[in-house]
Every structure is written in C-alpha cells, then in structure tokens.
C-alpha cells in the first residue's frame, strides 16, 4: 500500500515537472555521453531565437520559437545548467531570418526595452550584447514572427 502511494506521488511530481517545462517553451541542449553541450542547430530555424550565456555564442544556450513570451527569465529550465536561472545572464543571441525578439531589463516586461529583428533573408547574429548595453541585463522577453515585431 505504501509503495502504491509513493508511486502515485512520484508520478504526479513527474507530470507536474513535465508540464512546467513545456509551459516555459524553452528548448535547451542536452549533454552528450561525455557531458559536453551539443552544438547549436545549424542552420538555426527561420522562426527561432537562440540565446547564449556568453559572448560569441558560447556557453549554455536555449532556443525559443516565435510567439513565445517569458515575463520572468528565472523560470527557464535548461537541463545542462539546471541550477542557474537566465535572468540577467544572456550575453549573445542569434535571430532566425523570419523572427524577432523584444526584451526588457526587468521582469514582467518593465524597464528599458530593446529588440532585434532579422531581415527576412538571413540570420541576425549578435555576438556580444556588451556594446549595446544589454549584456547580462535581460529579464523578460517575447519572440515573434518578423512580420509581427511591432506587436511585441
């Protein structure tokens, strides 16, 4: 009887965790057998934005497809870096050719606002957010199709 109850609790926890991961909309890399982070998709999907922990597209990363919102980047779970939230951690990004991203300095879409949009024919690569003043300062974001950037 006790085992049945424990199994039920574990199953419930697993379903809740799975639902939470799906609701964030984040797709992160999984480590390979050697514990290394796999390469970033190349080419990146036309309708996606990839965010990197370090400049020059290095370190851990996660990918959002268009029409995803995250009002608090502390809520993203990336399997290879589970103990680190992404609030104030993004240092470079790549925007798929049919995508755009709008981001804010504070959670809940408050504070200073910035954005990047690809031109429809090629990926927009931003190797460093240091110069634009956004390095490790993004706390919430929205991704959209390039044609809907103004609606962010």
Regions of interest found by a model, annotated:
Residues 2-13:
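Bacterial N-terminal signal peptides that target proteins for export
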Residues 2, 27-152:
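Compact beta-sheet-dominated domain cores in extracellular/mature segments
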Residues 12-24:
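Bacterial N-terminal signal peptides
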């Amino acid at each position: 009887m006790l085992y049945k109850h424990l199994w039920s609790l574990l199953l419930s926890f697993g379903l809740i965790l799975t639902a939470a991961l799906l609701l964030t909309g984040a797709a992160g890399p999984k480590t390979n057998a050697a514990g290394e982070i796999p390469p970033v998709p190349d080419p990146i999907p036309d309708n996606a934005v990839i965010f990197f922990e370090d400049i020059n597209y290095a370190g851990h990363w996660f990918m959002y497809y268009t029409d995803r919102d995250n009002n608090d980047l502390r809520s993203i779970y990336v399997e290879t870096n589970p103990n680190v939230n992404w609030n104030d951690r993004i240092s470079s990004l790549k925007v798929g050719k049919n995508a755009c991203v709008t981001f804010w300095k504070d959670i809940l879409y408050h504070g200073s606002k910035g954005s990047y949009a690809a031109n429809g024919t090629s990926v927009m690569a931003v190797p460093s957010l240091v110069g634009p003043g956004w390095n490790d300062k993004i706390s919430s974001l929205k991704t959209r199709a390039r044609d809907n950037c103004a609606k962010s």
